[in-house]
């Protein structure tokens, strides 16, 4: 949609430029029509203003090929716009298009009606004008001067409006510059960010080192434990081998104990081996001694090993506890590491945002620098042009003074010349009259001969011929002088027109260049804005995805916590219901016992009365029977109550078991809740970071809103600048009517032009055709002019090449110097920032020092006052006088404050208890009366127990209002259990 808005803005700008061009063309055409009014009057053709209004036919447009539909399809194909949104936008666009078509049709109809009515009005106005302007049809010089005055006034007002617009643009640009500078100052400095990142890196490195050290210690302890276990296993194996060897030796001993019996039986056979056996016995005895010694040593060793094993087990347990502690610390450190990682990620994201902002600011700075340099260049160029124009003005003023002096001199000379040329025609006429008289006299003379008369007649005829030739030549000379004057005037006019055209051409070229520069600048800005928008869109997508993840996790955690709270509340409600039911049953049992004791006392009193009273024996018997029946019933009720008590005891035991189980579950859930709270804290920290980022984005949105407000303010100013909207609308309607009339007139003229039978189709141009010689001369002159212009162009090309080479060299030098200036500027900025930071720190330290000094002075004053107060109190006590009334008041105030604090704490605890009591199961607090959540069922045989209503508890209906008293009340349905 942003692209669409930008396209719409560009289209509106193009339309405004088109309207301006149309207005300029209308003015030119008005001038042309004003100049060509005389020709039109001669030809008796109706003249109509032809406005250049470009009305697009919306009915003939294919909606699928419009840029809006194409842009929507592109966005849908890229995945930026969903299908439903695209369909909605298409439907809106089609509706708007239909409304535009209908408005165009109605406008065409209205234009046709207006055209018809305007034609009638024009006809009537022509008739009225012909009637009114009968005596003074011709235009006077006063009217022309009035027209010129109005034209110059309009030009002056247009220049004033242009100047006001330029000043307004300057003010708006200065305001934008100040806003941008404020935002640039708000951006955090890179030095602070680097400090923060450095501190975070140092802390993370220290934590990493500690973690590595702890891991190494844990690893060494585990290796020691493994070595001790291996040593124990090895020693156990050696002990088992020694035990087996001992058993074997015992068997040998037993075997050898039976040998002497065999020896006694076989003395004769073993006489030879006696010595050997004795030797063997000696050896075996020595070995036995050694074995017994070794056994003792082994036993001692086993005891020592068992002691060592106990010590090692104790050490292992201690190490295990230490290991558990270290593992907990390790877990905490891991959590801290995760938090630091998350903080690092958030700081990296912030750093990315700041880098983007910094890059954008640098680009904006470069753009503003370029614009400033361009403005300076334009200023210098305008300054040069101004100097040139001033010089030209001086030259023209000097020339004007010279021309005025020449004019005065010529006027004086003309006055000095004698005015004989004025009397020449009169003298010529007089001489002609005298000559005619002489001729007549000669003709009347009769003394002349015929030959002389003929000669006289011939001379008279020759004289007449010569006079006629003289008159014709005089006329020719006069005509030639007049023609030369006309030609000179035409030449001067053409030269003036040529100079005007040249000036206009140069102005148009300058305007085109400036417009091209502006177009390039706007294109650069557009590309830069698109790039920034893409970066911000990617950042926004990442932030939105992370936020959605965290929000989902939060929702899950909240749901689990709410479920656990609801279960806990349900179990507590059940417990309260059971407790209430047990209390009510105990009360009923006590009442029954009281009734039973009362019945027993009544029975005893009745028996006493039976002994005393004999008259009422029958009645007492009946009463006795009734009492017996009631006793039976009460006994049965007691048995039922006892059974119910047994059942209640069982239920109570079950409830206790459930409570214990729920307590265990609650402990587990509390642990889970603690874990969730830790996660929630982590999520809250992340949320805080996200809130900071959102705050930054909101600041940007606020800045954009400010820009929108500025644009709206500009629009309102432009609307205020154009207060004659209604008159303009009326002019537009008139122009549209004239446009339709012009189209009709053009069609008629085209028909006349195409018609071959019309007489006025061909119009011969007045004047003489040139001869071949004159044409050849003219061509030679034109060729010479072309050759001269080509020479000048070649010279200019050569100069341009040399200047371009010089400028390229200068460009290279300037670019090399730019890098040096950039480095110097960066260093200067860094030093300035350091100086600012140091000065700020110094100022802060000075301020802290001054605050501390002020505090010390105040404390010293208080100490002096307290010492004086203590001294005065001790003096009064030594004298035996009571203390001041102020001390008593202070003590009473302290006591009153303590009482008020105790009362406030009690009130707070009471309110807290009330709020806990008023909290509903869904977590909402209420001050309304609690609805009953259980009811007592009706029962004749046994005591009823309260039963909960469940989810759909009944409510107490309010009294119907005055507007519902005529409606019948609803029938209350019985509760089915």
Curated annotation (Swiss-Prot):
Source organism superkingdom: Eukaryota
Disordered, as annotated region: 1-48
Stretches with biased composition (Acidic residues): 8-29
Biological process according to GO: cell morphogenesis; cell population proliferation; cilium organization; flagellated sperm motility; gene expression; manchette assembly; nucleus organization; single fertilization
Tissues and organs where the protein is expressed, per its UniProt entry: Widely expressed. Expressed at high levels in testis (at protein level).
Molecular function GO labels: protein-containing complex binding
Coiled-coil blocks: 204-238, 267-343, 631-658, 693-722
Gene ablation phenotype (knockout): Knockout mice are viable and do not show any overt phenotype. Males are infertile. They exhibit normal mounting behaviors and produce coital plugs but fail to produce offspring after mating with wild-type adult females. Significantly reduced sperm count and motility with spermatozoa displaying morphological abnormalities including short, coiled or absent flagella, abnormally long manchettes and abnormal sperm heads. Abnormal organization of outer dense fibers and axonemes with mislocalization of Odf2.
Keywords: Cell projection, Cilium, Coiled coil, Cytoplasm, Cytoskeleton, Differentiation, Flagellum, Spermatogenesis
Mutation effect (residue 245 to D): Abolishes interaction with Ccdc42
GO cellular component terms, semicolon-separated: axoneme; centriole; centrosome; ciliary basal body; midbody; sperm flagellum; sperm head-tail coupling apparatus
Subcellular location: Cytoplasm, Cytoskeleton, Microtubule organizing center, Centrosome, Centriole; Cell projection, Cilium, Flagellum; Cytoplasm, Cytoskeleton, Flagellum axoneme; Cytoplasm, Cytoskeleton, Cilium basal body
Transmembrane segments: none
PANTHER family (UniProt xref): CILIA AND FLAGELLA-ASSOCIATED PROTEIN 58-RELATED (PTHR32083), COILED-COIL DOMAIN-CONTAINING PROTEIN 146 (PTHR32083:SF34)
Subunit structure: Interacts with CCDC38 and CCDC42. Interacts with intraflagellar transport proteins ITF20 and IFT88.
Function: Essential for sperm flagellum biogenesis and male fertility.
Protein name: Coiled-coil domain-containing protein 146
């Amino acid at each position: 949609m942003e692209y669409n808005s930008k396209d719409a803005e560009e289209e509106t700008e193009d339309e405004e430029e088109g309207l301006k061009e149309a207005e300029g063309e209308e003015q030119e055409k008005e001038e042309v029509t004003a100049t060509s009014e005389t020709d039109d009057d001669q030809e008796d053709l109706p003249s109509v203003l032809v406005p250049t209004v470009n009305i697009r036919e919306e009915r003939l447009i294919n909606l699928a090929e419009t840029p809006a539909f194409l842009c929507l399809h592109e966005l849908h194909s890229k995945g930026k716009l969903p299908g439903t949104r695209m369909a909605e936008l298409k439907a809106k666009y089609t509706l708007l298009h239909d409304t535009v078509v209908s408005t165009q049709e109605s406008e065409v109809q209205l234009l046709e009606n207006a055209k018809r009515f305007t034609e009638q009005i024009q006809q009537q106005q022509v008739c009225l004008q012909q009637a009114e302007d009968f005596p003074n049809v011709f235009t006077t010089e006063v009217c022309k001067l009035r027209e010129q005055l109005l034209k110059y006034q309009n030009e002056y007002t247009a220049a004033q409006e242009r100047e006001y617009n330029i000043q307004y643009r300057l003010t708006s640009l200065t305001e934008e510059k100040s806003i941008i500078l404020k935002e640039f100052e708000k951006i955090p400095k890179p030095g602070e960010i680097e400090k923060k990142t450095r501190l975070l890196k140092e802390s993370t490195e220290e934590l990493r080192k500690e973690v590595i050290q702890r891991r190494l210690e844990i690893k060494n302890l585990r290796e020691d434990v493994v070595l001790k276990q291996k040593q124990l296993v090895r020693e156990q194996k050696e002990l088992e081998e020694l035990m087996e060897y001992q058993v074997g030796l015992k068997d040998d001993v037993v075997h050898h104990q039976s040998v002497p019996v065999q020896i006694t039986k076989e003395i004769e056979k073993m006489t030879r081996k006696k010595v050997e056996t004795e030797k063997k016995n000696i050896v075996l005895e020595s070995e036995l001694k050694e074995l017994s010694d070794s056994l003792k040593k082994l036993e001692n060793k086993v005891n020592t090993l068992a002691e060592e094993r106990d010590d090692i087990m104790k050490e292992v347990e201690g190490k295990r506890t230490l290991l558990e502690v270290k593992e907990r610390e390790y877990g905490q450190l891991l959590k801290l590491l995760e938090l630091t990682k998350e903080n690092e990620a958030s700081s990296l994201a912030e750093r990315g945002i700041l880098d983007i902002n910094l890059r954008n600011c640098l680009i904006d700075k470069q753009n503003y620098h370029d614009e400033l340099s361009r403005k300076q260049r334009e200023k210098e160029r305008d300054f040069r042009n101004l100097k040139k124009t001033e010089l030209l003005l001086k030259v023209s003023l000097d020339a004007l003074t010279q021309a005025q002096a020449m004019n005065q001199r010529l006027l004086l000379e003309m006055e000095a010349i004698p005015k004989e040329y004025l009397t020449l025609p009169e003298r010529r006429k007089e001489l002609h009259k005298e000559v005619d008289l002489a001729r007549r006299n000669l003709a009347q003379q009769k003394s002349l001969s015929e030959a002389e008369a003929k000669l006289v007649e011939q001379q008279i005829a020759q004289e007449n011929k010569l006079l006629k030739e003289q008159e014709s030549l005089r006329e020719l000379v006069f005509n030639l002088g007049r023609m030369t004057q006309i030609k000179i005037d035409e030449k001067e006019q053409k030269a003036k027109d040529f100079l005007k055209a040249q000036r206009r051409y140069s102005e148009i070229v300058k305007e085109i260049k400036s417009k091209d520069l502006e177009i390039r600048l706007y294109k650069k800005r557009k590309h830069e804005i698109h790039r920034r928008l893409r970066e911000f869109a990617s950042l926004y997508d990442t932030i939105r995805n992370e936020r959605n993840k965290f929000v989902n996790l939060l929702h899950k955690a909240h749901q689990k916590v709410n479920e656990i709270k609801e279960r806990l509340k349900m179990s507590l409600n059940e417990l309260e219901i059971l407790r209430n039911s047990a209390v009510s049953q105990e009360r009923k049992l006590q009442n029954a016992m009281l009734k039973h004791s009362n019945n027993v006392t009544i029975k005893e009193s009745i028996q006493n009365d039976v002994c005393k009273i004999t008259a009422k024996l029958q009645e007492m018997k009946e009463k006795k029977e009734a009492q017996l029946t009631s006793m039976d019933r009460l006994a049965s009720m007691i048995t039922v109550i006892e059974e119910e008590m047994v059942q209640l005891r069982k239920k109570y035991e079950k409830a206790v078991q459930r409570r214990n189980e729920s307590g265990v579950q609650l402990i587990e859930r509390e642990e889970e809740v603690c874990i969730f709270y830790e996660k929630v804290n982590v999520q809250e920290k992340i949320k805080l970071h996200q809130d900071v980022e959102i705050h930054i984005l909101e600041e940007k949105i606020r800045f954009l809103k400010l820009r929108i407000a500025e644009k709206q303010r500009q629009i309102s100013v432009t609307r205020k600048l154009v207060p004659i909207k209604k008159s303009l609308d009326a002019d537009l309607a008139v122009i549209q009517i004239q446009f339709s009339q012009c189209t009709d007139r053009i069609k008629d003229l085209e028909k006349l032009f195409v018609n071959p039978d019309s007489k006025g189709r061909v119009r011969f141009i007045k004047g003489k055709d040139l001869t071949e010689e004159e044409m050849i001369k003219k061509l030679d002159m034109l060729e010479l002019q072309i050759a001269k212009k080509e020479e000048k162009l070649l010279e200019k090309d050569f100069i341009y090449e040399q200047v371009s080479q010089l400028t390229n060299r200068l460009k290279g030098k300037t670019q090399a110097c730019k890098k040096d200036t950039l480095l110097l500027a960066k260093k200067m900025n860094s030093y300035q920032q350091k100086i600012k930071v140091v000065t700020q720190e110094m100022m802060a330290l000075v301020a802290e020092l001054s605050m501390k000094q002020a505090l010390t002075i105040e404390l010293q004053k208080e100490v002096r006052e307290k010492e004086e107060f203590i001294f005065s109190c001790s003096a009064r006590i030594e004298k035996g006088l009571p203390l001041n009334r102020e001390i008593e008041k202070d003590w009473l105030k302290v006591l009153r404050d303590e009482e008020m604090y105790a009362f406030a704490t009690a009130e707070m605890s009471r309110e807290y208890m009330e709020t806990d009591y008023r909290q509903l199961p869904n977590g909402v607090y209420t001050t309304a009366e609690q609805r009953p959540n259980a009811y007592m069922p009706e029962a004749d045989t046994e005591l009823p127990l309260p039963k909960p209503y469940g989810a759909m508890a009944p409510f107490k209906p309010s009294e119907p209002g005055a507007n519902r008293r005529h409606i019948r009340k609803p029938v209350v349905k019985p509760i089915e259990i």
